[in-house]
Amino acid sequence: MSKPVRMEPGVKLRDGDKMALIPVKFMPDPNEEVLRKPDWMRIKLPPSSQKIEHIKSTLRKNKLHSVCEEASCPNLAECFNHGTATFMIMGAICTRRCPFCDVAHGRPLALDPDEPQKLALTIKEMGLKYVVITSVDRDDLRDGGAQHFADCIKQIREHSPQTRIEILTPDFRGRMEQALEVFRETPPDVFNHNLETAPRMYRVARPGADYKWSLELLRRIKEMHPHVPTKSGVMMGLGETNEEIVQVLKDLREHGVNMLTLGQYLQPSRHHLPVKRYVPPAEFDELKDVAMGLGFSHAACGPFVRSSYHADLQAKGEEVVGYKAK
């Protein structure tokens, strides 16, 4: 019998400790062979550079987090080398425990009231013209953290009025009305919320989330702010079918979503959901054609695409290549 996992405030639970708390258990098949990465998923990571170290030190100095590091994003070196990062607010401990995600679970600490200003000053110091702000889920907060998002938006606009702001939000489950009231007064330049996967996969991949709820959040934001582009991201390789993904794309368009990111799921550790298949670049290209045919203004589709991958280019409608030359 495994020992109980203690939930101390501010303590990060990862890997096996995190997965032990998931209500819907998935048991890896010991006889199932672990899929090897195909050639198109093999890239040579660049050595650490001054830009990478500068961004990391800037984040540490200002006590800020990036989802690039906390979620073990495979594009970290590329993005940091280009001087970009996706900031993660409200701490680095999530109240959810999705088995595809490498962000730590636990009991988060209270919000840092100085974080919005520290974030804004950091963005000004870095001279960023386009920023993506995301967060952990904060089910412990009355509004799910919506006001903290708004405070960050206000501070960034005060210190860097020319900087465009994209927010990648949680679902505000059970707190949608409070969140919408906040965003009514303080909308971002782009509103992003990820569906992540097909509805059939939700019980295993997104415990605590609801597919229709997420679609409704996107619809309500678009209804409230028709001129604010809405965006969503989906992973492939969890066991879904291409037909299910096409239906997800149709659902997104029916709920007014303008922009799409579609990428390959990668297993963060042996404790996480396994990769069921690696989707070839040609299939991503085909799904991009489907997405554009459905009326998305922009669709970034490819193995290495993530929600905020070259988000500035996506927002401009420029082409984003989602796979890399070896």
Curated annotation (Swiss-Prot):
Sample GO molecular function, one term: metal ion binding
Transmembrane residue ranges: none
Lineage of the organism: Bacteria, Pseudomonadati, Pseudomonadota, Gammaproteobacteria, Aeromonadales
Name this polypeptide is given: Lipoyl synthase
Family, similarity comment: Belongs to the radical SAM superfamily. Lipoyl synthase family.
Keyword Nucleotide-binding (UniProt): no
Chief localization: cytoplasm
Pathway this chain belongs to: Protein modification; protein lipoylation via endogenous pathway; protein N(6)-(lipoyl)lysine from octanoyl-[acyl-carrier-protein]: step 2/2
